[in-house]
Design a protein with these regions (language model features):
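Short N-terminal binding/cap micro-motifs at the start of the first secondary-structure element
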Residues: 13-18, 41-42, 82
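Extracytoplasmic/periplasmic beta-strand context in beta-sandwich domains
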Residues: 18, 85, 100-101
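Residues that mark the start of a beta-strand
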Residues: 5, 29-31, 145
C-alpha cells in the first residue's frame, strides 16, 4: 500500500510527523491530495489545551485536527466530484485531516473551486464560513450598536 506523510498530535503539546498508509475509500467518499493547509485557532486549542472531544482521544487520528485546506481530487466514489477537481475542505474539525498528504473525506465537506483560480486567496474562504455561521446565529442587528472583535488569521 502507498504511504504518505502525516502530522499527528500524540499528546498535549506534542506533534510528530510520521509515515502512514494512504486511506482507502469507502462508498461515496472522496480522496483529496492536500495542496494547502492552514492552522486554525481551533487547532491550537486542541493541541495545546485539549479543547474539544479530541482531548480524550490522544493520540489523534493522522492529519487531525487540521480542517482548513485546499486540495485536488485524486479518487472519487461520489457522483458529485471528479478526478482533477480542486476543492476546499469545509471546516469540520472531526472529518477533515488536512495535516496529511491525503485525506478520505465525505463529499458534504467539500466545495468545488473554480478552475485556474488563485488557491492561496481561496484558502481564505475558510474564514468566511465562520462569519456566515456567526451572522446566522446573532439575529437581526439593524439599528443596533455592535462590535466585531478578533480578526484572526485573515485580519
Amino acid at each position: 500500500m502507498k504511504k504518505m506523510r502525516a502530522a499527528r498530535a500524540i499528546k498535549l503539546k506534542t506533534i510528530i510527523c510520521e509515515e502512514v498508509e494512504v486511506p482507502e475509500l469507502t462508498d461515496n467518499m472522496v480522496l483529496v491530495k492536500t495542496k494547502l493547509a492552514s492552522i486554525c485557532g481551533s487547532d491550537l486549542h486542541v493541541v495545546n489545551m485539549g479543547y474539544t472531544a479530541y482531548a480524550s482521544d490522544f493520540p489523534l487520528p493522522y492529519g487531525a485536527p487540521g480542517h482548513e485546506g485546499v486540495g485536488e481530487v485524486i479518487e472519487s466514489r461520489s457522483p458529485d466530484f471528479s478526478i482533477g477537481e480542486t476543492v476546499l475542505t469545509d471546516p469540520n474539525i472531526y472529518s477533515s485531516k488536512t495535516f496529511a498528504d491525503y485525506q478520505a473525506i465525505d463529499p458534504k465537506y467539500l466545495v468545488k473551486l473554480p478552475k485556474n483560480s488563485n488557491e492561496n486567496k481561496l484558502m481564505m474562504a475558510q474564514q468566511l464560513a465562520t462569519v456566515e455561521y456567526s451572522s446566522k446565529s446573532i439575529g437581526d442587528i439593524e439599528g443596533k450598536t455592535i462590535a466585531v472583535i478578533g480578526q484572526g488569521s485573515a485580519g
